[in-house]
């Protein structure tokens, strides 16, 4: 078995240790997608949206829908900014096509969360 050869460093570098620098990639800030309560959007439609656009199970969707209904808002999911904004646009367009005033917003998560 042959050993791989390591190319020599620059001239005059014999016997010196070469340091490689690593840059750390900062994780992107996360955004919450919130569904906001209104008096007109049917609860079953909110459940359908959560299942279709946020891949929630029926049970998860019902719990989030109840939070929206009782607390005024519920967290549909937490994503990077681009994904969160896309979800907001998709759900808003779908709700408008279906004739529902469902409001969806994205907000940055707090740094400590």
From Swiss-Prot:
PANTHER family: ATP-DEPENDENT CLP PROTEASE ADAPTER PROTEIN CLPS, ATP-DEPENDENT CLP PROTEASE ADAPTER PROTEIN CLPS1, CHLOROPLASTIC. Residues 1-24, 92-113 are annotated as: Disordered. Belongs to the ClpS family. GO terms for biological process: protein catabolic process; proteolysis. It comes from Deinococcus radiodurans (strain ATCC 13939 / DSM 20539 / JCM 16871 / CCUG 27074 / LMG 4051 / NBRC 15346 / NCIMB 9279 / VKM B-1422 / R1). Involved in the modulation of the specificity of the ClpAP-mediated ATP-dependent protein degradation. HAMAP family: ClpS (MF_00302). Residues 1-11 have a biased composition (Pro residues). This is ATP-dependent Clp protease adapter protein ClpS. Binds to the N-terminal domain of the chaperone ClpA.
